[in-house]
């Protein structure tokens, strides 16, 4: 039997995302002109949908090496070059040199467009949206979510939540929107506040900007821009069944990430995740990162280090949640109801294949399609993009 991930890998090189049928592409008049494309997805069966896309020039793997050489001012020949196709990536979206003001305007326009279009796909007016939860590894501004919501025409009183927990940020945002058990004493219960309301949840990752000052060759080859936003009505179009929250600090510095967001370091209740009320309508959820000592944006260990960081914990959490799910299905009298598909973070293909192998040893097996070949690792955006690409195939 084929591995559930290997069976889904595209054998032929992927064309540019902008050339994909159904993608609405334009050039934003910022700097020299920035390509920007979105694809709209809606499931009439499930009554929900969203938009996903990217911005910046689409580089294939050969072109990417030339781009990195120009950015670093040195050759990429030798041991530092990855076999990116084997890692599941054919393309990445990157930006030319822009000023800080241009980066801000670009990501504000991209974010506002994503929110407007995600609302429209779901048949909502922007003025009807009552919650916006966005995950970002390194926001271009502390109040980015507030700014894009305002620019998109979403009411001022709508609850805005910024989530900064690296690649987990968008799924952390979705978890907050659905699971009322995540609330702590004295703080707003986000899931209860948003139950039955029209909510936009997503991940927006300007990783070309984020890595523009990095010197780490692994990071420069893997990461790129990407975003995805879905519309949900918590408790109706999507509801929480079972789940698990797990925190693990990267003590060894296998993936060092600079925190470009407020974090006091108070470790309330011993948690690595800090929740603060940035404004009456704005909640910030910020995770503690192992920051690079040299002040650079990002420093990565090699592929073996990434496997060590992601696989062991990921497999354990999935195993625990699967046990809870199976127990729930037995209680509901549907013990044979299996998981139809798993939407997984696309850090790289080899990591996901190893996760699937380890889960299979534990008797856990379900499809985990590889869906982001023309994006690269887009951190918090990857699950949202993967979900939207899989959405037309999901049945109720």
Task: Give the label of every model feature segment.
Residues 126-129, 156-158, 196, 336-339, ...:
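A general structural motif
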Residues 1-77, 113, 172-274, 384-396:
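Conserved beta-strand-centric core segments of catalytic alpha/beta enzyme folds
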Residues 85-100, 299-309:
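Gly-rich Lys/Arg/Thr-decorated short loops/hinges at beta-loop-alpha junctions or inter-strand turns
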Residues 22-36, 40-42, 103-123, 127, ...:
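Hydrophobic pocket-lining "lid/loop/helix" segments that shape and contact the acyl-thioester
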Residues 84-94, 102-105, 136-198, 204, ...:
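Conserved catalytic cysteine-centered active-site region
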Residues 140-141, 208-209, 349-353:
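Flexible loop/turn segments at secondary-structure boundaries
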């Amino acid at each position: 039997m084929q591995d559930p991930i290997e069976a889904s890998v595209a054998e032929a090189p992927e064309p540019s995302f902008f050339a994909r049928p159904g993608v609405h592409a334009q050039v934003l008049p910022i700097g020299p002109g920035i390509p920007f494309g979105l694809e709209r997805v809606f499931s009439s069966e499930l009554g929900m949908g969203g938009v996903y896309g990217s911005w910046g020039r689409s580089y294939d793997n050969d072109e990417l090496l030339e781009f990195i050489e120009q950015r670093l001012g040195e050759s990429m020949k030798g041991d530092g070059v990855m076999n990116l196709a084997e890692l599941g990536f054919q393309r990445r979206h990157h930006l030319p040199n822009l000023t800080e003001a241009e980066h801000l305007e670009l990501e504000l326009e991209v974010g506002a467009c994503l929110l407007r279009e995600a609302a429209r796909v779901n048949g909502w007016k922007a003025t009807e949206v009552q919650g916006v939860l966005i995950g970002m590894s390194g926001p271009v501004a502390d109040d980015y979510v507030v700014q894009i919501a305002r620019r998109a025409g979403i009411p001022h009183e709508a609850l805005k939540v910024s989530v900064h927990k690296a690649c987990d940020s968008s799924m952390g945002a979705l978890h907050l929107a659905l699971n009322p058990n995540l609330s702590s004493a004295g703080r707003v219960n986000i899931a209860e506040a948003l139950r039955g309301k029209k909510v936009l949840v997503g991940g927006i990752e300007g990783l070309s900007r984020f890595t523009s000052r990095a010197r780490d060759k692994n990071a420069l080859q893997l990461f790129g821009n990407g975003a995805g936003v879905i519309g949900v009505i918590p408790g109706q179009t999507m509801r929480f069944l079972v789940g698990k929250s797990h925190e693990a600090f990267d003590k060894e510095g296998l993936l060092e990430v600079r925190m470009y967001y407020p974090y006091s370091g108070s470790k309330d209740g011993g948690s690595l995740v800090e929740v603060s009320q940035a404004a009456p309508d704005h909640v910030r959820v910020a995770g503690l990162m192992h920051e690079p000592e040299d002040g650079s944006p990002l420093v990565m260990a090699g592929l073996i280090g990434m496997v060590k960081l992601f696989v062991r914990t990921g497999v354990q959490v999935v195993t625990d949640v699967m046990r809870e799910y199976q127990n729930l299905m037995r209680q509901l009298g549907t013990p044979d109801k299996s998981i139809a598909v798993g939407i997984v973070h696309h850090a790289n293909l080899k990591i996901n294949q190893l996760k699937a192998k380890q889960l299979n040893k534990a008797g856990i097996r379900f499809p985990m399609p590889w869906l982001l070949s023309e994006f690269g690792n887009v951190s918090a955006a990857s699950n949202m993009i993967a979900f939207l690409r899989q959405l037309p195939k999901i049945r109720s």
